[in-house]
From Swiss-Prot:
This is Large ribosomal subunit protein uL30. Component of the large ribosomal subunit. Homodimer. Interacts with DHX33. It comes from the Eukaryota. One of its GO terms (molecular function) is RNA binding. CDD domains: Ribosomal_L7_archeal_euk. The gene is RPL7. It holds the Pfam family Ribosomal_L30_N. The modification N6-acetyllysine is found at K84. The keyword Acetylation applies.
């Protein structure tokens, strides 16, 4: 009976989130349309969420860069993590910019990363998220009891983002299909490093 009730609750939550995401998308489109009509530019809200991928090794790098990569939990090449964007984290990303590719993940990317490559940190071990009970056991006290809750908390950068993000083990991504262009050159100069804004979603597809 308890399991049935839990399943129903999870289903209701998923339905609610789906509606919320649709609403967010519609609002964005409406605002852009209104701005265009009034002859203005629509400036979207500042992104709150980044996905950061380490794209280079760190032989011979300064201790400062090494330390920041550790703080971002990017200990190996092609590791990826979610980062809440604020002044402090943006400064950290600037310090390690030549070693990372980052940008603003969309809902599809967050969804696919967590469903396909999501591992939780349970008793300091890397455990595949095959069951909602694993999530409920670790994050239930924050009302995060299933995959959909976890995705919602990360994507919307909710008030328990830190706990949800720390629960997620850094993502181990594959080497990108088609390879990298130039790891040492910034994205805006035709390379791979640095902020590629929405284009990060393309890179995630190639690595997931």
């Amino acid at each position: 009976m308890l399991r049935k009730a839990r399943r129903k609750l999870i289903y209701e939550k998923a339905k609610h989130y789906h509606k919320e995401y649709r609403q967010m998308y519609r609002t964005e489109i409406r605002m852009a349309r209104m701005a265009r009509k009034a002859g203005n530019f629509y400036v979207p809200a500042e992104p709150k969420l980044a996905f950061v991928i380490r794209i280079r090794g760190i032989n011979g790098v300064s201790p400062k860069v090494r330390k920041v990569l550790q703080l971002l939990r990017l200990r190996q090449i092609f590791n990826g993590t979610f980062v809440k964007l604020n002044k402090a984290s943006i400064n950290m990303l600037r310090i390690v910019e030549p070693y990372i590719a980052w940008g603003y993940p969309n809902l599809k990317s967050v969804n696919e990363l967590i469903y396909k490559r999501g591992y939780g940190k349970i008793n300091k071990k890397r455990i595949a998220l095959t069951d909602n009970t694993l999530i409920a056991r670790s994050l239930g006290k924050y009302n995060i009891i299933c995959m959909e809750d976890l995705i919602h908390e990360i994507y919307t950068v909710g008030k328990h983002f830190k706990e949800a993000n720390n629960f997620l083990w850094p993502f181990k991504l594959s080497s990108p299909r088609g390879g990298m262009k130039k790891k040492t050159t910034h994205f805006v100069e035709g390379g791979d490093a640095g902020n590629r804004e929405d284009q990060i979603n393309r890179l995630i597809r190639r690595m997931n």
